[in-house]
């Protein structure tokens, strides 16, 4: 049981965030309205084009930081509790937005592997809409909050009905929601003897197995692997960006 499981009212939730009551939360949500508390601006993407960042203003950012902190505490508490169960192994799968993890630790998992497969999740942050965020906090057993409190969490975290890139609460919420996807993916990866990790929307798989029957045609087993991956990804509410799917061998990466 976590601190969230014990919440009864909005005031309980406010106190969990370190506030005296829900008065400040109600003021932002229903008087000012959170959609009026963002500054939006474009930043260039590494491979061309632009990404729009929605940065919360200080009043909302203050609240989102508090939400992020208590979600992290609950997340770590859940992992610690499960790690005590000998039948449960907590794999290190997500390397983005995780304390002690980075793009470097993500790449280290695939060092010296013969083949590396990269799969990109299309419009990653847009996949986390208001209903999905709200539903997660109602249904997930680590939280299991009332519909009223789940609605408040989603209102604090979402901008124009989605999790915004630029809000301090977005990273932890995306990692919480994608945990189930990661666990499903790692089962498929193990079945085909792949190592799997994820950095936000970038999934990486690697293996030392021989994947190509010849240089022009991909093996049937790899096709089956990709088909199973796609089925799980789509059923989990995400979409693959086919333009960014890439298979490379160690000779190509030199």
Where do the language-model regions lie?
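Non-catalytic, polymerase-adjacent accessory regions of viral genome-replication enzymes
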Residues: 1-46
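Conserved polymerase palm-domain catalytic core
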Residues: 106-200, 204-250, 254
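Short, conserved non-catalytic motifs in the polymerase core
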Residues: 39-64, 83, 94-96, 155-174
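N-terminal, well-ordered alpha-helical segments
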Residues: 11, 41, 61, 65-69, ...
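Generic structural signal for well-ordered secondary structure
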Residues: 6, 56, 60-68, 130
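N-terminal low-complexity, intrinsically disordered segments
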Residues: 13-25, 70, 81-91, 122, ...
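Active-site-proximal segment of RNA-dependent polymerases
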Residues: 63-116
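Short amphipathic beta-strand starts and helix->beta connectors
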Residues: 36-39, 100-103, 188-192
């Amino acid at each position: 049981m976590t601190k969230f499981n014990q919440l009864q009212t909005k005031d309980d939730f406010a106190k969990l965030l370190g506030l005296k009551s829900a008065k400040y939360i109600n003021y932002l949500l229903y008087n000012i309205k959170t959609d009026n508390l963002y500054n939006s601006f474009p930043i260039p993407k590494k491979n061309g084009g632009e990404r729009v960042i929605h940065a919360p203003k200080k009043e909302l950012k203050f609240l989102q930081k508090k939400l992020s902190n208590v979600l992290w505490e609950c997340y770590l508490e859940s992992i610690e509790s499960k790690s005590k169960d000998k039948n449960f192994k907590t794999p290190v799968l997500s390397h983005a937005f995780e304390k002690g993890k980075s793009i470097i630790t993500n790449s280290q998992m695939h060092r010296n592997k013969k083949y590396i497969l990269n799969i990109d999740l299309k419009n990653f942050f847009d996949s986390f809409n208001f209903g999905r965020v709200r539903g997660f906090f109602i249904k997930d057993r680590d939280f299991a909050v009332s519909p009223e409190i789940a609605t408040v969490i989603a209102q604090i975290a979402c901008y124009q009905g989605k999790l915004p890139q630029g809000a301090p609460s977005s990273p932890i919420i995306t990692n919480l929601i994608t945990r189930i996807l990661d666990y499903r993916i790692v089962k498929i990866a193990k079945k085909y003897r792949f190592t799997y990790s994820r950095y936000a929307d970038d999934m990486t798989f690697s293996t030392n197995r021989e994947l190509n029957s010849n240089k022009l045609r991909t093996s049937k087993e790899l096709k089956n692997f990709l088909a199973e991956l796609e089925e799980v990804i789509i059923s989990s509410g995400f979409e693959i960006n086919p333009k960014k799917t890439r298979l490379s061998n160690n000779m190509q990466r030199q």
